[in-house]
UniProtKB/Swiss-Prot annotation:
Role: Catalyzes the reversible isomerization of glucose-6-phosphate to fructose-6-phosphate.
Pathway assigned to this chain's UniProt record: Carbohydrate biosynthesis; gluconeogenesis; Carbohydrate degradation; glycolysis; D-glyceraldehyde 3-phosphate and glycerone phosphate from D-glucose: step 2/4
PANTHER family: GLUCOSE-6-PHOSPHATE ISOMERASE
Reaction catalyzed: alpha-D-glucose 6-phosphate = beta-D-fructose 6-phosphate
Protein name: Glucose-6-phosphate isomerase
Top EC class, one word: isomerase
One GO term (biological process): gluconeogenesis
Keyword Nucleotidyltransferase attributed: no
Cited PROSITE patterns: P_GLUCOSE_ISOMERASE_1, P_GLUCOSE_ISOMERASE_2, P_GLUCOSE_ISOMERASE_3
CDD domains referenced in this protein's UniProt entry, alphabetically: SIS_PGI_1 (cd05015), SIS_PGI_2 (cd05016)
Length: 553
């Protein structure tokens, strides 16, 4: 049997402490410590992180840090950074942090100079995107490229989509990006709508160049391009309108892409950790190699903080442990991520894959069952949209939902308010600060009664407060800050995975469904009535589908 973290004295001490503290509220904690608002906060790079509105005391944090040490967090963190094979089920190193090492750094893993490999790919990406952005790279008809379409799925899509939207203000070369992921043809059709084949370039992002959804979309895109250009130009166009992010040179060549325009990455990069690799080629095409370097530098800044800061002043460690505190001791199952920036509209969706694919595991790294809940469920929408949708549940519902608020002092865009005298960004951020305040401190029946509210309405207006949140405030949404935010959450995922004893870097749970889909496709499309399926529900669904498609049921 593997080591059971819940059987350790550190876990049991936390359990006893939870019994003692769970009745305390944030009003009382702030009243007891007038300096709490600044004492439970720290600055990492451009991020000011306020964790004072959490249901924790100094003792809570000390006990959580004892748990981290009991689980061997410092040694396991060092093992990750050094290139040890901590992805045990696949016997792989986990080196997304190497993707943002500076050129003069040194890291050799399994006999390979990792830093040299990373920068060789970055240099090739930079040279390619320089040609694209300057207009030197031309399509088959001699026109310059104005749109790149990234075709990928999962980590090959969610990261680039999110970062492209977040950094839209840094698009400075007349190139825009679109993203196709879903095998539903509606996705590709919508994204190609209005595009000119002569000025469109496709990036096919698939490590193996065999991902079903990606290759299906890529083949349809190739047909659209060839048909759109017509004649000999269409037949010869693939090499000038398609590039690949892959490691399978043979299949890339078979598709018609010049392997000189293939950008690779490595087995030690998981898809959900890959936006700062060649998977970010579409981002670099839009914002340029210098801004992309700033993006990588933001990651590296937080990497170095996570690697070297004392545990008690280490932002990813503290935030990861606080997330685990709610998940395992308060029974909270979800965490809301609420960016007060419309440019971060896809950040919660990006974090869903990062966190839930990483820590959605029911066995420990040694294959034995876990003894406690794992994997926070992440969700969210930008403020203030969420305030008019689901904040009601956050404020007055029966479920505890810790929330992360992310905001910026300087806007990427600003407009005057209705009377022409104020700033819409100030209005946005007043909501940010108000929501964290009301979640924490609420409003009592006595306060509401004192305002003259009818007695029968008072219970409906009571805001219980004591709803925890983290506030992350940065000066402005820049390439570096986006990198810092991503790394902050990457390392929280690692911290929680270490405590739970799971492998946060495999994803076997996604495989069986893909295999079964391949088996079911001929059942859906075959000319003859299919054999009965193994369960009556699937059998009935398949037959109804075939009937509605005009096929023999």
């Amino acid at each position: 049997m593997g080591s059971d973290i819940t059987a350790t004295p550190a876990w049991q001490a936390l359990s006893r402490h939870h019994d003692e503290i769970r009745a305390k509220d944030l009003r009382g904690l702030f009243a007891d410590d007038p300096t709490r608002g600044t004492g439970f906060a720290l600055t990492v790079g451009d991020l000011y992180i306020d964790y004072s509105k959490h249901r924790v005391t100094r003792e809570t944090l000390d006990l959580l840090l004892d748990l981290a040490r009991t689980a061997g967090l410092p040694a396991k963190r060092d093992a990750m950074f050094s290139g040890a094979h901590i992805n045990t089920s696949e016997d792989r190193a986990v080196l997304h942090t190497a993707l943002r090492l500076p050129r003069d750094a040194s890291l050799t893993v399994d006999g390979q100079d990792v830093v040299a490999d990373v920068h060789e790919v970055l240099d090739r990406m930079g040279d390619f995107t320089d040609r694209l952005r300057s207009g030197e790279w031309r399509g088959a008809t001699g026109e310059r490229i104005t749109t790149v379409v990234n075709i990928g799925i999962g980590g090959s899509d969610l990261g680039p989509v999110m970062v492209d939207q977040a950094l839209r203000h840094y698009a400075d070369a007349g190139i825009s990006a679109r993203f196709v992921s879903n095998v539903d043809p509606a996705d590709l059709v919508a994204k190609l709508n209005g595009l000119d084949p002569a000025t469109t370039l496709f990036i096919i992002a698939s490590k193996t160049f065999s991902t079903l959804e990606t290759l299906t979309n890529a083949t349809a895109a190739r047909r659209w391009l060839v048909d759109g250009l017509g004649g000999s130009a269409g037949q010869d166009a693939v090499s000038k309108h398609f590039v690949a992010v892959s490691t399978n040179a043979k299949l890339v060549d078979d598709f018609g892409i010049d392997t000189a325009n293939m950008f690779g990455f490595w087995d030690w990069v998981g898809g959900r950790y890959s936006v700062d690799s060649a998977i970010g080629l579409s981002v670099m095409a839009v914002i340029g190699r210098e801004r992309f370097a700033e993006f990588l530098a933001g990651f590296h800044l937080v990497d170095e903080h996570f690697r070297s800061a004392p545990l008690e002043a280490n932002a990813p460690v503290l935030l990861g442990l606080i997330g685990l505190w709610y998940s395992n001791f308060f029974g909270a199952e979800t965490r809301a991520v609420l960016p007060y920036s419309n440019d971060l509209a896809r950040f919660a969706a990006y974090l869903q894959q990062l966190t839930m694919e990483s820590n959605g595991k029911s066995v420990r790294a040694d294959g034995t069952p876990v003894s406690t809940g794992t994997g926070e469920i992440f969700w969210g929408e930008p403020g203030t949209n969420g305030q008019h949708a689901f904040y009601q549940l956050l404020h007055q519902g029966t479920r505890l939902v810790p929330a992360d608020f992310i905001g910026f002092s300087e806007p990427t865009d600003d407009l005057p308010t209705a009377d022409g005298t104020g700033s819409m960004h100030d209005l946005l951020m007043s909501n940010f600060f108000a929501q964290t305040q009301v979640l924490a401190f609420g409003k009592t029946a006595e306060e509401i009664t004192g305002e003259g509210t009818p007695p029968n309405v008072v219970p409906h207006k009571v805001m219980p407060g004591n709803r925890p949140s983290t506030s992350i405030l940065a000066t402005k949404l820049t390439p570096s800050v986006v990198g810092q935010l991503i790394a902050l959450y990457e390392h929280q995922v690692f911290v929680e995975g270490v405590i739970w004893g799971i492998d946060s870097f495999d994803q076997w749970g996604v495989e069986l469904g893909k295999t079964q889909a391949k088996a079911l496709l001929p059942v859906l499309t075959g000319a003859d009535s299919p054999a009965a399926q193994s369960d009556s529900s699937t059998d009935a669904l398949v037959r109804r589908y075939r009937t509605e498609r005009g096929r023999t049921a």
